[in-house]
Amino acid sequence: MLLERVLGKNRAWLAAHADEAADAEAQNAFAALAQRRGDGEPIAYILGVREFYGLEFGITPAVLIPRPETELLVELALERIPANAPLRVLDLGTGSGVIAVALAKERPQARVTAVDVDYAALSVARANAKRHKVGVRFFCGDWFGALAGERFELIVSNPPYVAAGDAHLGQCDLAFEPQRALVGGADGLDCIRAIVAKAGAHLDPGAWLLFEHGYDQSGACAALLAAHGYRQMQSWPDLAGIVRVSGARAAQNVLK
């Protein structure tokens, strides 16, 4: 992949010209990229792109690297957005915008809004919406802070949910990613608590709230949803069998 980037050629071309030597400039450029990779820097940051839900997205160190398991959240959301229905959909903590853009791409009639507290992340998200020619409203704010009086028929989120003391934070890709987008407090649930507590004031009655969480957090998430008056709580496993997403429907008496 690094050599493809340096030479601007695909793998088929490289295979057909395997006996040809690259010039000195290309060799130096490749060596620099290889050094970054050797130092552990994620390939997505080196190349500046990552595929998600069949689409290529621009990625910078200002945002998390999209994971395949997050596609489950997109699939569950799409099941709740009828084709050609102008549903009001909100993506909280949008980061690179992959969830919002994928939903807008798959459901062009949906009215998708995305929020993030970080201006740099929103810049990446806006660029990705432009890249894929979709209309998404973007707001900078802390969860619902910029959305006073607005209500939605579906809210989705992939919030920070890693516990502050998790040893994995200093390993592999996580060591290079923005910690504010990963860490959700001492137990990893601070952001989920805030979302669950406040979402009821922004959901239509019966509307769904869906969010990704850690492998061992589904029980705590179900308890939070129940405590705030949501109904029909459910959790879903990813392709590896790990419970990855939980959600529920808002009721008339959701606690504000």
Stretches with model-predicted labels:
Residues 1-79:
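Conserved AdoMet
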Residues 161-191:
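Mobile active-site "lid"/loop adjacent to the S-adenosyl-L-methionine
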Residues 252-256:
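Flexible, glycine-/basic-rich loop-and-beta segments that form/coincide
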Residues 2, 40, 70, 99, ...:
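Residue-level signal for inorganic ion chemistry
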Residues 56, 111, 135-137, 231-234:
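Conserved beta-strand segments of alpha/beta enzyme cores
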Residues 46-49, 58, 139, 212, ...:
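Solvent-exposed beta-strand sheet faces enriched in polar/charged residues
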Residues 186-249:
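Conserved Class I SAM-dependent methyltransferase catalytic core
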Residues 69-168, 194:
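Conserved SAM/SAH cofactor-binding pocket of Class I
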